[in-house]
């Protein structure tokens, strides 16, 4: 399903590492996130045997040491013999934006605090993972003449075997480079980063690391 979804909503397709052997070829696609979400929703709604109920799950119901269902914030209960919880970033989620932090599942959405406490009470092992999101810049604020164009593949390869061909125009990407002035500004403001001022405890990703973690390592 995910392969079909990206084939239908992708805005650029590119096969990475093409200059090397097939073993390391890596297909990459960028999607219109709103179209992607809507496409998946509509595809699932067409499936038989699936009922859709919108609401916030606050607790997991257990009876005789077996799963029995869930209760929603509205007080409604739905009973089942098996339950799959796809938590994403919502369980007691925290967002850090520079020195500021607040509870959230993701930007603009509240965290799932009650569900987190319910799972803790059932003695699930608990941990926390970190994700990083690059800052967004407004298109009108960018001087594209100073950037290098990176176009998608002329004959892109679909992600799904069920897709015969990819249709629609692709959108160009642009490559920018930093310089010593940028690196100097980053180093001067490392104390404002939650990774360095103690707000976040843990180790960041090894690959695709943030610019300022690279600068800190170079010092």
Indicate where each model-derived feature is located.
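Amphipathic alpha-helical blocks
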Residues: 198-211
